[in-house]
Each structure stands twice: as C-alpha cells, then as structure tokens.
Amino acid sequence: MKLQGSLACLLLALCLGGGAANPLHSGGEGTGASAAHGAGDAISHGIGEAVGQGAKEAASSGIQNALGQGHGEEGGSTLMGSRGDVFEHRLGEAARSLGNAGNEIGRQAEDIIRQGVDAVHNAGSWGTSGGHGAYGSQGGAGVQGNPGPQGTPWASGGNYGTNSLGGSVGQGGNGGPLDYETNAQGAVAQPGYGTVRGNNQNSGCTNPPPSGSHESFSNSGGSSNDGSRGSQGSHGSNGQGSSGRGGGQGNSDNNGSSSSSSGSNSGNSNSGNSGNSNSGNSGNSGSGSRDIETSNFDEGYSVSRGTGSRGGSGGSGGSGGSGGSGGSGGGNKPECNNPGNDVRMAGGSGSQGHGSNGGNIQKEAVNGLNTMNSDASTLPFNIDNFWENLKSKTRFINWDAINKGHAPSPSTRALLYFRKLWENFKRSTPFFNWKQIEGSDLSSLQKRAGGADQFSKPEARQDLSADSSKNYYNNQQVNPTYNWQYYTKTTAKAGVTPSSSSASRAQPGLLKWLKFW
C-alpha cells in the first residue's frame, strides 16, 4: 500500500508540473519560470520521499516477516531488535541516495521546462520588417553645348587647316546624374558608360562603350569651304560642321565634329588626309558620322547602324579622301538579355571617295551602268538559252527537218499518222482474219510484200484462197498464222514526198474496211 501511494504521489507531481507549465503561453516568462521551478521541486521531493519511505518500509516489513517466520516468536523478537536496526540504517542511507537522485532528475526537468518556456517566448514575438531602400535619384539632363568658334580656312595651297580635338568623354557616376561636356567645337560629348541602367533587374549589367572613336578628327584640305550645318541631335546635342547627312558634297568643314545623341555613343573614325597633288590643293575628306535613332527600350540605349559619308572628289591631280567608317554599337553581356539590346548593331563602314584629275564621281556611275547594260549574260532572260532548252525537252519533234525546210505536207503527215494507228489496231486484234476482211488481191500483196515470185503461178493463188477460206470458216488453229503486210516507208530525210493518191493506193484495206462497217 505504501508503494502504491508513493507511485500515486509521483503521478500527482507530474500532473501538477504539466498543469503549471500550461500557462506558459499566456503568462509570460516570469510565470513560466516560477511554474518550472515549482514543478521541479515537487518532482524531486516527491520522487525522493516516495522511493525512500517505500523502500524503507518494504525492507523493514519484509525482514520482520522473514525473521518472525524462520525463528519463532522468541527468536524473532530478539533478532528483530538487533538486526532490524542495522538494516533500517542501511536502507535509510539507500533511501537518501535515491532521494538525491530524485532531486537531480527534478533539476533536469526544471531545465528542460525552462528551455521550453524560452523557446515559446521567442517564437511568439515577431520582429518588424525592414524598410525599403531608397531609390536613387534620377540624373538630370545635360545642358546644351554652345557651338564653338568656326575654324579659319587657309588660303595658301598645300597647307592643311588644323582643327582642335574634341574634349574627352565624361564618365558618368554610378546612380548619379550623367556628366556632359562640350568640346572645343561645340559638340556635346556622350554620357559616360559603365553606369547601371534604370529599371534593369540585372544589377550587374553595364554597357561597354561602342568601338567607335570618342573624339572627332577632321583635318580638311586647303581652301575648303564652310560645310553646311549638321543635323540637330536628340537631347540637346548640336553638331557643328558637316555631318553624315548635312555635309556638303566634296568639301568637308573645318569644324568636322559629328552629331551625337543622349544615351548612345556615335563612334567617329579618324578621317584620313588626302594625298598631295602636283598642282593645286588636294581633295577634302568627308568626316565619318552615324545616323542616330532613339527608341523607347531602356533609357535611350539604342544605336542604329550608321553609314559613313562619302569622301569628297579630288581637285586637279588630287585623290579624294576616304570617308570615315561608322563606329560599331556597344557590346552586350550575355546575362543582360533585355529587349533593348537586340537593336544594338554594328556600324557600317564609310564609302571610299574616288577622286580623279578634275573629274566627277557621276562619270563612274554612268560608266558602271553602261557596262552593266552592255553585258548580255547579266540579263534576266536570254532567248537563245530558252530556245535551246525548249528543243532539248521536245526531242520527239524533228527540229532538223523543220530548220532545213524538208518537212512533208500536212495531208501526207496525217495519212502516215492514221496508217500507223491502223497497223497498231490490227496488231492488237489478232482474232480477226484481216486478209479476208480486206479482200486484198494478189497484185496488191505482191506490191506490198515484194514477193512477186511466190504468187506468179495460178495454182499458188488457188491454194492461197482455199487455205484462207478454210481458216476463216473452220478456224481450227489455236494461233492462226497471218501474212502481215509491211509497207515500204519513204523517210522524210530522203527528200521523197508521197502524194495523197499514192497514200490511198497503199491503203486499199482501210477503204474496204470502212465500207464493210
């Protein structure tokens, strides 16, 4: 009974510990800690007392019963006084050790419950979400550059007009406004490359600059006229001097800077100086430029294919300068697959100026057209080739006879054609006795078969008629033999043209067959 009571106390202590741990979700950290401490003390004291008292009482009662039954009432009372105290002392020590073990178990349970309280408390509180990062400020548009001073042309022949170089391109800062600079000629420099595009999810995508030159070199020849004003570039760029579209033909301006637009770099190549002539000034070289088109892809980063301007025609004895080649569009990284990147194409190369001794470029164009028109092989249709192909595909026609004029008359050709059809019909119907149907006489057979010696005797004629009548009426043979007639043909190449009367005489059986039907 004592042992059962101890177990009941242990279960009650555990239940109280579970009930004390229940308010942890609502009471906070202090309530959970106190409940855990109380549950640990209850478990330790309950286990120690229950185990110690139960073991002590069970051992005492067991020893007393054993000694009483084994030695009788007298000996039992004597031994009970001496040995009972010894066993009771030892069992008390064992009970104390078990109580210490129960206290240790209680402390471990208290630590476990306290850890659970801390975990529940930490999970119940949620931290506030971090704020969104501030967006970078939009870079301001550049100020339009003022046109620079006009270059002074030199009057003396053979000297080259100098032209100051354009300023270097400013490097745009990351996230900052785009830097614009004006060069000495007034052309607005392009925005710096290397900046991150706006609205681009690939933060590491930067645009390398195009392969064209950032600076404009345009050294014009002597005694050059002022070129026409360049076309107005987009976003405040103003080209001074001759550009790809507005430059005067033959003469390049001293202020040879190209037009540019915001968000794209027009690559201008160095236009070479033309050669010296024996007399007079050398031709002027056209400055390379590109036609810039803006689009709505990614902040204006679309570069279309540019074409270089044609070099000017040479003066007397001077050769024309070469046109500048348009710069190619900037490269794209493979990971930056944006829709705007597909339009960035390579720039076209400028055309070479062909100068002659006082000549004109239009003469070469006219000569080229005349050469193309005079060449018959380049024509899309050639009647000779067509006629040869037609004759090769229609070999059943005697083209040689047609070309030589030896073709037979239409009536003769019709009779020959029908004769061929008639012979084919008789060969396809061997079950008819065509000799009796046609009723051909011996003279016609001799003429057609060429065997006059075979049918010269009357007996042979009678035997032939008797045999043929017998074969016609009795028809005893399975495969009757026929005397097929083969007519002598006169070829058209031999030059013999049979008349209609001769053709009708060669076909007496055909006329009789028509009368029979």
Swiss-Prot record:
Role, per record: May act as a soluble regulator of keratinocyte differentiation.
Family to which this protein belongs: Belongs to the dermokine family.
Protein name: Dermokine
Ranges of Gly residues composition bias in the record: 127-145, 167-176, 236-250, 308-332, 347-358
GO cellular component: extracellular space
Stretches for region Disordered: 51-83, 123-364
InterPro entries per record: Dermokine
Cleaved signal peptide residues: 1-21
GO biological process: cell differentiation; cornified envelope assembly
Post-translational modification: O-glycosylated.
Lineage, uppermost ranks: Eukaryota, Metazoa, Chordata, Craniata, Vertebrata
